[in-house]
């Protein structure tokens, strides 16, 4: 297992402390130099004499700091691999150092005027997160010495759709902001339609079920119900169409003035965003759909946005705690029958309680079904605050993608090797295979020529066809040889995507003509298949292979070898579908291993900024209107048409950076969070080879714990030679991510109440109840876990029916509805657990299981004794 990720953390025993301290001191020294170098001729204020006079105050500060550090020691050891309770873990050294450096400068990231450096870092870092999630980031302005082609690409990219993301204080604010945008985008077309009718504007839109070839509809010809249910992206681009129509109605008016007129007209509409919501909500009451496993912030958002928590419809979950898409379809249809409109569906990309991932790909299919069959669409938001960074596993570098494709080609050509091959070796095998074919074809051409010569000498046969065959073979061989030379060139310069592209063309154009004997059938398969692309099956198979490990479950003289893997096609399909949703929440301060507070909200279409923009006269920002659409960082006032006509130098233009403040829900926000995220992302890129290593380690540790829990009941009785008074009970399928939920069943009390009592008792062994005023230190606590309660209002009985049947519980349904089910929860995000097992002779998962066994056996005895008394 690659342990490179251990270089990015301080270590469970602060093993990397020397590097950390040295770098921290370098940051402090540089900061001090920065202060001293600004107007160095200014007078010193605090003299040595004054410092001596201030010794009492300095002593007080030092004493208070000492007291503070003493009190902080009562903290839970979140950094330790023994802490597996809540979504807390060690944070990376880049994030700590970045936060500390950014904190010293204390910039306010609302605007470049208050944060000239960290605002740019936030844009940079969030662009990397957009890429990780599958969204396209805004184009980066070319450098001054860029080529004309680079500028042409930049101009073209500006006209395409790209995403936008920014830092929030956390997932709650990110969810609220995403649903705020969804609400505005949903009802915006009503205001445009009303203005278009009163002002005589000509605007066209497409209904959700329209095919690409269908003509659009005039906006004033559609009913209000039809217009309020158009696709989110259609509504977003409607803003630009509206401003363009206003421009046509106000000829010879400056573009900024046109924007003001458009805003004024919209503000006067009774459906406008500035009007009260009573009118629009009474006509078209909104509904948000999410599962019972969703975060409570969804209902909080509904209250804040005036939608009301009662209009958040809870969708059933299946036995793996994933949203039941069939029930979602049923609930949406019920809402439509009641005259309500689906505002948004909030899917969860790893639930807080169980780490479950909703089937986003199936929800997208359902949305398409509603669009095609009922002309109804809705916003799809994914709350992936916890699991968003798992997407780094699927961000492959060019060489990795090409290597997987070459494996498929080698398999088809039946060129197999027992040992792992490098990318270069795979390429050489393919080149050798095709070059061998040229040798065979050349021999065949020679044979044909020899036959002709022999026949002409003997004058026994007509040689016309043999001559043609030999000629065709030689012509084909000549063209084929040139293409092979081209393939070799791309391989030598390591342009692997061009190599694959050329290989595909070669096979399509020459494959069956040139391939000889045994390869011909294989080449025909290559010509007809999508083997040059990575399918969902390919991604699923190779990811499961990458996130796999061999473990040993050993206790006393008994042991079993296990191969553990993470993934599966439904789960991988969900993550890969993120790129097609409208917005995503992801928390760097969770599986990004960044300090709190650092959440991120990401939008697929940057143009949503037009819908939520506020104006603050004290914040300077470039012009924003729907016709001239620039990303947050862009070339100021560039006129590409004029530039081409005058052939002016590109370096006369300046890069402008927009303020965040007008476009976000929050106000002031720390530049330190941006510095932390930027340094972390720059040091640990968000791809499989880097951040993916941390994620891999975490997922495998969770799978190992699940395997121990699932095997323990039978395995332990054999190994220990005695009967257990309890059973560890998991919920069937392996966990979707790195949260492992389980309960402990009392063998002498086969009721839910029995499970709840024993589970609660065991929990007390693994916690310091600070929330109840317990102020003890954590030094003697061997492990920490958390608990949660599954209740009928959020988790339907059907989700647990299989679990209850496996446990042979009596009166399970009635008891569950009355009392709920208490479960233990292990959040395995610590980056050290798997590495400790592999690099040392210690297995912390095994140690935890043994401690859990002791606590369970002891608690079960205690409960038996209480019942006897």
Regions found by a protein language model. Give the residues of each.
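Short secondary-structure boundary/capping segments
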Residues: 181-185, 303-309, 359-364, 394-407, ...
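Conserved PLP-binding catalytic core of the aspartate aminotransferase-like
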Residues: 721-807
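PLP-dependent enzyme catalytic core of the Aspartate aminotransferase-like
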Residues: 464-467, 471, 483, 487-488, ...
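PLP-dependent aspartate aminotransferase-fold enzymes
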Residues: 1-6, 88-99, 105, 109-344, ...
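Glycine-centered flexible beta-alpha turn that most often forms the glycine-rich phosphate-binding loop
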Residues: 383
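Active-site C-terminal subdomain of aminotransferase-like
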Residues: 355, 406-440, 466-515, 520-738, ...
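N-terminal entrance/gating region of PLP-dependent enzymes' catalytic architecture
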Residues: 1-163, 173, 186-194, 217-232, ...
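Secondary-structure transition/capping motifs at alpha-helix termini
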Residues: 135, 185-192, 305-310, 334-340, ...
């Amino acid at each position: 297992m690659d342990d490179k990720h251990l270089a990015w953390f301080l270590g469970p025993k602060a093993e990397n402390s020397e590097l950390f301290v040295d770098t921290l001191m370098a940051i402090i020294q540089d900061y001090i130099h920065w202060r001293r170098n600004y107007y160095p001729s200014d007078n010193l204020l605090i003299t040595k004499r004054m410092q001596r006079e201030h010794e009492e105050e300095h002593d007080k500060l030092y004493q208070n700091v000492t007291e503070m550090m003493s009190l902080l020691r009562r903290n839970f050891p979140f950094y330790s691999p023994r802490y597996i309770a809540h979504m807390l873990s060690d944070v990376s050294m880049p994030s700590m150092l970045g936060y500390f450096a950014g904190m010293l400068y204390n910039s306010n990231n609302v605007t470049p005027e208050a944060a000239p450096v960290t605002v740019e870092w936030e844009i940079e870092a969030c662009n990397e997160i957009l890429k990780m999630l599958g969204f396209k980031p805004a184009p980066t302005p070319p450098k001054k010495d860029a080529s004309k082609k680079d500028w042409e690409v930049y101009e073209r990219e500006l006209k395409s759709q790209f995403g936008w993301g920014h830092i929030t204080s956390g997932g709650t604010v990110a969810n609220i902001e995403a649903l705020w945008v969804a609400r505005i985008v949903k009802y915006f077309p009503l205001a445009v339609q009303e203005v278009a009718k009163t002002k005589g504007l000509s605007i066209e839109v497409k209904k959700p079920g329209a095919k690409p070839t269908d003509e659009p509809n005039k906006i004033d010809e559609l009913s209000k119900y039809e217009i309020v249910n158009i696709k989110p992206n259609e509504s977003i681009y409607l803003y630009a169409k509206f401003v363009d129509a206003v421009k046509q109605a106000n000829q010879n008016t400056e573009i900024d003035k046109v924007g003001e007129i458009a805003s004024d007209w919209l503000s006067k509409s009774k459906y406008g965003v500035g009007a009260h919501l009573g009118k629009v909500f009474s006509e078209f009451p909104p509904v948000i759909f999410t599962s019972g496993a969703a975060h409570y912030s969804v209902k909080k958002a509904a209250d804040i946005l005036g939608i009301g928590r009662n209009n958040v419809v809870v969708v059933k979950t299946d036995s793996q705690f994933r949203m039941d898409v069939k029930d979602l379809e049923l609930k949406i249809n019920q809402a439509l029958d009641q005259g309500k409109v689906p505002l948004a569906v909030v899917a969860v990309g790893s639930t807080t309680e169980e780490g479950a991932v909703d089937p986003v790909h199936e929800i997208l299919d359902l949305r398409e079904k509603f669009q095609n069959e009922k002309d109804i669409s809705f916003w799809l938001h994914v709350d992936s605050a916890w699991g968003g960074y798992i997407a780094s596993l699927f961000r492959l570098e060019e060489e990795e993608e090409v290597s997987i494709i070459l494996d498929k080609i080698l398999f088809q050509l039946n060129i197999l090797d027992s040992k792992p091959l490098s990318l270069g070796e795979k390429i050489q095998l393919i080149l050798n295979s095709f070059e061998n074919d040229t040798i065979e074809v050349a021999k065949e051409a020679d044979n044909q020529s020899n036959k002709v010569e022999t026949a002409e000498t003997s004058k026994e046969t007509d040689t016309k066809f043999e001559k043609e065959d030999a000629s065709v073979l030689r012509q084909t061989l000549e063209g084929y040889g040139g293409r092979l030379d081209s393939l070799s060139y791309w391989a030598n310069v390591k342009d692997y995507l061009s190599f694959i592209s050329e290989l595909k063309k070669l096979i399509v154009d020459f494959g069956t003509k040139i391939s000889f004997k045994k390869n011909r059938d294989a080449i025909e398969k290559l010509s007809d298949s999508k083997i040059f692309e990575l399918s969902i099956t390919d991604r699923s198979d190779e990811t499961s292979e990458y996130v796999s490990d061999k473990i040993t479950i050993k206790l006393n003289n008994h042991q079993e070898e296990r191969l553990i893997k993470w993934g599966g096609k439904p789960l991988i399909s969900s993550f890969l579908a993120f790129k097609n949703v409208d917005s995503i929440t992801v928390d760097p301060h969770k599986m990004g291993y960044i300090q709190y507070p650092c959440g991120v909200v990401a939008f697929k279409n940057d143009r949503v900024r037009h819908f939520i923009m506020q104006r603050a006269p004290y914040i300077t920002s470039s012009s924003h209107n729907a016709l001239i659409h620039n990303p947050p960082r862009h070339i100021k006032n560039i006129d590409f048409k004029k530039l081409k006509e005058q052939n002016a130098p590109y370096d006369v233009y300046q890069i402008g950076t927009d303020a965040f403040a007008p476009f976000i829900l929050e106000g002031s926000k720390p530049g330190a969070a941006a510095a932390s995220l930027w340094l972390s992302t720059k040091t640990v890129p968000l791809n499989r080879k880097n951040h993916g290593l941390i994620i891999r380690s975490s997922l495998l540790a969770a799978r190992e714990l699940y395997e121990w829990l699932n095997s323990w009941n039978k395995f332990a009785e054999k190994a220990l030679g005695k009967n257990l008074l309890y059973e560890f009970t998991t919920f069937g399928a392996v966990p979707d991510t790195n949260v492992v939920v389980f309960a402990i069943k009392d063998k002498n009390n086969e009721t839910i109440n029995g499970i709840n009592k024993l589970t609660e008792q065991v929990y007390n062994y693994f916690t310091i109840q600070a929330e109840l005023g317990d102020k003890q230190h954590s030094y003697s606590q061997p492990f920490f876990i958390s608990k949660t309660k599954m209740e009928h209002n959020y988790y339907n009985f059907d989700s647990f029916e299989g679990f209850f049947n496996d446990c042979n519980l009596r009166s399970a349904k009635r008891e569950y509805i009355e009392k709920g089910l208490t479960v233990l929860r292990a959040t395995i995000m610590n980056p050290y657990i798997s590495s400790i097992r592999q690099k040392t002779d210690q297995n912390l998962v095994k140690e935890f299981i043994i401690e859990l066994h002791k606590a369970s056996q002891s608690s079960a005895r205690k409960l038996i004794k209480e019942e006897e008394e």
